[in-house]
C-alpha cells in the first residue's frame, strides 16, 4: 500500500507515475473523499472541544447551585452527535483505505516504461540453445511416451490443468526441488521454512493478492470460522512471518526459502498454454523471500536474481534475463527481473522465475517494521520475493533440453546425486 500522506501531498505526480503502469488513479474520487474526511474530522474535533468545555461548566454550575439539567441534556446530545461524527469519519476512512488497497506500487525510476510485455528489456543471456540433429518432442510427448506423464487420469481426478507424474519423472521433479532447496540453504544463506498452505485473508491482503485479485485464488468457505485460501505462492506465508512485528536491526536481513505447492485459478488465462505443464492450477515452486533494511533492497534484488540464475546455470539450461517494464510488473513490485528458460519445442524462452523488490509496499500493509538503530524509532522494512525456481517449468526445460533421439532423457550432472546416480531415464 502506498503512503497515504504521499498520495495526498503528491497526488498529480503519483497519478502520472501510475499511468505508466496502465493504472488510472481516480483522482476526483480521492480528492472528494479526502475533502469529506477533513471536513468531518474538523467538525468532530470542534464538537469534542465544545463538549469538553460544557462538561466543565456542569461542575461549575452545580457548585453555584444552578439547575444543571439543561447542560446535561446538551452534553448528552453532543455525545450522540460526536458518536455519529466518528462513525461517519470511520466510514470515509474505510473508503479511502479500500481505494489505497487497490492502488499498485510505484515503479522505480530505473524501470523501463512500457505498456505490456513487448516493453520489457533484455538485460543478459546465458548459454546457447542446443541444436538437435533429430526431430524434437515436447515434454508432453516425452512424458506420455514412457507413461510418466498422465493428463487424462489427472483430468478424471481434478479436471483440466492438472498433471499426474509417475516413476522416473516424479523422481526427477522431486530431485529438482531438493537440489534447489539445498543450493539456496547451503550456498545462498537462506533459512528453510515449512509453511501452511492455507492462509486467512489478512495474509493475502498483506502481500497484495487481496482485495484486487480474489478471482485468481482458491477459497475455502467456512461457516463458523474465517474463510481460508490456498496459497498462490509461498511468498504469502513467508513474507507474513514478519507481519505486525518490530524487528531488531541485527536480525536483518531475514532470508527464507520454502518448497510448496501453489494454487491458482488462472482466471485470466483461458485458452493459453492448454497443453502440458506450463500453466497449471497446482504446481510446485521453490520461493525465496528477503526482509531487509530499506537502503539495501535494490542490492538484495540483484543478489536474489543471481541466486535464481545460479540454479539455471548449474542445470546448464539456456536462459535470458529481462527487466520488466512498468506495464508488465506485478501489483506489489517496485522493480522486477524475469528469467526465461529456453523451451526447444516452442522455439522460444518462457518465464521460469520472477524476482521483485516490493519496497515498503507490502510492509505497510502488514505493518512489518524494524527499529532503526540511528533514530531508535520503528520504520517499515523492505520485502523481496523471487522464484528459485518454478519446479514444474524447470522439469519441462530439463525434459526438452536433455532429450535424446530415442526419447530418453539424460540426467543433468547436478541432479545425479538426487537420482541415485542414474544417468539416463527412459
Swiss-Prot record:
A Pfam family recorded for this sequence: Seryl_tRNA_N
Binding, L-serine: 233-235, 287, 387
PROSITE patterns on file: AA_TRNA_LIGASE_II
CDD domains: SerRS_core
Keywords: Aminoacyl-tRNA synthetase, ATP-binding, Cytoplasm, Ligase, Nucleotide-binding, Protein biosynthesis
Family label: Belongs to the class-II aminoacyl-tRNA synthetase family. Type-1 seryl-tRNA synthetase subfamily.
Full protein name: Serine--tRNA ligase
